[in-house]
């Protein structure tokens, strides 16, 4: 996360993940009737400091979403930290688990803050973290959070940009979605970085890269990759004519698959010297689900 993005941009960091923040008014019927359910799922409250009970859910999501860092005990301690003096009138941190006979399949860490308007409860649910292994489990947790007693709205900061919630809400406008920036990525050894990730489609493209701070990245590179985990990948210097010209900042932005090189070309940040090269590279670099990093560090 960048304290001031323009500073990081000067040193080659590109905006690689985004998130969406929403404020959902309380409504037991907030979700459309067609939203998936799972009758086998049960919800129960748990001690948030017993994070080992739900850590597996986080790690499962992290293996599928680029940008989510793995956590050791110190990181988990930070994730569930609850300092009474810093609550600002909110409740202690709470945890709800979604589980079935196979075990825990989702969880949410949240706090509530009481407030009354003319004797009517209008408090706020503030969600610190929400992870689910699949859509039905995610929907069950949302239903719970959107109908807590005495609450007026639920605040969900930094959701993935492809989270299904806005498609599930019967009135998404009332959620006031706001798009925000997230993780900034800097490629230090671009050849090693580009062969370390998988690609969604075959690609053979020549990149002309500018890098003011890491001169070993500067120059023309041929990136040739196959699709999938086991496909061959190579990134080597070449004297072939460039097909895409870009700064290392923009390569960092595209690296996790959340920023399209075609978008950057449209914005004038990438120069396309061979027609179609940006679209081909965008298809190869793309990743679903979208990259995401809700943790601020």
Regions inferred by a protein language model and the residue ranges of each:
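Intrinsically disordered, low-complexity, positively biased terminal segments
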Residues: 33-297
């Amino acid at each position: 996360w960048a304290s001031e993005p323009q500073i990081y941009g000067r040193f080659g960091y590109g905006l690689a993940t985004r998130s969406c923040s929403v404020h959902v008014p309380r409504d037991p019927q907030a979700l459309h009737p067609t939203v998936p359910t799972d009758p086998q799922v049960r919800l129960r409250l748990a001690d948030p400091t017993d994070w080992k009970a739900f850590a597996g859910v986080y790690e499962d999501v992290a293996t599928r979403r680029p940008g989510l860092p793995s956590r050791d005990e110190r990181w988990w301690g930070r994730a569930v930290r609850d300092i009474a003096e810093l609550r600002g009138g909110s409740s202690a941190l709470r945890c709800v688990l979604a589980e079935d006979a196979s075990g825990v399949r989702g969880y949410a860490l949240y706090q509530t803050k009481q407030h009354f308007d003319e004797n009517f409860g209008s408090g706020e649910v503030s969600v610190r973290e929400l992870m689910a292994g699949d859509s039905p489990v995610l929907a069950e947790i949302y239903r719970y959070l959107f109908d807590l007693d005495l609450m007026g709205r639920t605040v969900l900061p930094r959701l993935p940009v492809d989270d299904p919630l806005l498609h599930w809400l019967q009135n998404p406008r009332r959620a006031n979605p706001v798009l925000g920036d997230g993780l900034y990525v800097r490629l230090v050894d671009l050849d090693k970085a580009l062969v370390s990730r998988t690609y969604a489609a075959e690609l053979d493209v020549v990149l002309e890269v500018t890098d003011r701070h890491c001169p070993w990245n500067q120059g023309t590179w041929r990136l040739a990759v196959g699709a999938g985990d086991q496909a061959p990948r190579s990134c080597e210097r070449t004297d072939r004519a460039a097909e895409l010209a870009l700064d290392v900042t923009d390569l960092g932005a595209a690296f996790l698959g959340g920023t399209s090189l075609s978008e950057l070309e449209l914005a004038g940040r990438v120069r396309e010297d061979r027609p179609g090269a940006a679209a081909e590279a965008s298809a190869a670099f793309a990743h679903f689900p979208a990259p995401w990093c809700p943790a601020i560090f």
